[in-house]
Design a protein with these regions (language model features):
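A short SAM/SAH-binding and catalytic strip from SAM-dependent methyltransferases
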Residues: 138-159
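Core SAM-dependent methyltransferase catalytic element
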Residues: 225-251
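A short glycine-rich, Lys/Arg-flanked "PGG" loop and its adjoining helix->strand segment in the class I
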Residues: 83-84, 156-171
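Class I SAM-dependent methyltransferase SAM/SAH-binding core
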Residues: 75-131
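Conserved class I S-adenosyl-L-methionine
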Residues: 65-74
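Conserved beta-strand signature within the Rossmann-like core of class I S-adenosyl-L-methionine
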Residues: 172-180
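Class I SAM-dependent methyltransferase Rossmann-like catalytic core
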Residues: 32-59
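A short acidic, Gly/Pro-enriched loop at the edge of an enzyme's catalytic core
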Residues: 130-140
Length: 251
């Protein structure tokens, strides 16, 4: 199967769910805090209080030995944590579309996490790189950028992405979408301007690909955020209201 990146790129060039109130129970997959220690900078660790990575690992039910895809990983904050969590018997794919690489190369791309010491379980995946085999992943994770897929690829490209994620997961596999919450009914222009997205739209689109909404975490919700500011506005940056949705592939 083509990589998730490749499937998303094909979407570029080829052209309210009631269950949203579900709250995940206390996780049975308790994360070990030592996964936050190895191979992470002081700068990254300083962000842990706001990003709550242990709660994220528990919600995503990450375990040693799993295969995890970190889709659009940015500087690799979660890639490193996943690498530590799945351990030497697991695999992490850091999946960045070629279009994104081309878009940001003039600004300087972060060095690949796979090149860091102790990261032999991390593999970089781009549109022309090695591919993730069909039905192999336990988890596909995307953080604060599902809205970007909409901005760059539109509804068709987003649907292609969701289908490729579904195909890449094992039966029973998990797709987690974490993003900045937008107002109900936020349109494409508002999405592009504010870098937010309506949670209900995400649920509608992902379940349309065959997924079941399996849980929601509220640990990053912020009722003080009125959803009207750009996420980069100093008044709200790092403190936006964020939804975290767990979808499961049947099986």
């Amino acid at each position: 199967m083509a990589s998730l990146s490749s499937r998303l790129l094909s979407g570029f060039f080829a052209a309210f769910c009631a269950a949203s109130s579900l709250i995940t129970p206390v996780a049975a997959f308790a994360a070990d805090s030592t996964v936050l220690d190895a191979g992470r900078s002081a700068e990254e660790k300083a962000r842990d209080a706001d990003r709550k990575p242990l709660e994220m690992l528990e919600f995503a039910q990450v375990k040693p030995g799993q295969t995890v895809v970190d889709y659009l990983p940015g500087k690799g904050y979660f890639t490193r944590i996943f690498s530590n969590a799945v351990g030497p018997t697991g695999t992490v794919y850091s999946d960045t579309p070629q279009l994104v690489i081309d878009k940001f190369k003039d600004k300087g791309l972060p060095p690949p996490v796979s090149a860091e010491p102790g990261r032999s379980n991390v593999h970089e995946v781009v549109a022309k790189g090695d591919n993730l085999g069909a039905s192999k992943a336990d988890l596909v994770w995307t953080s604060q950028n599902y809205h970007d897929v909409h901005i760059w690829a539109g509804a068709k490209g987003t649907a292609d992405l969701n289908k490729s994620v579904f195909d890449a997961l094992k039966p029973g596999g998990i797709f987690v979408v974490l993003d900045h919450a937008g107002a109900a009914g936020l349109d494409d222009a508002g999405m592009s301007n504010l870098h937010r997205i309506d949670e209900a739209l995400v649920i509608k689109e992902v379940t349309a690909a065959g997924f079941i909404l399996d849980g929601e975490s509220k640990v990053l919700r912020n009722p003080a955020d009125n959803h009207e500011l750009k996420v980069f506005d100093p008044a709200i940056r790092g403190k936006t209201d964020q939804f975290i949705l767990r979808f499961r592939k049947p099986g």
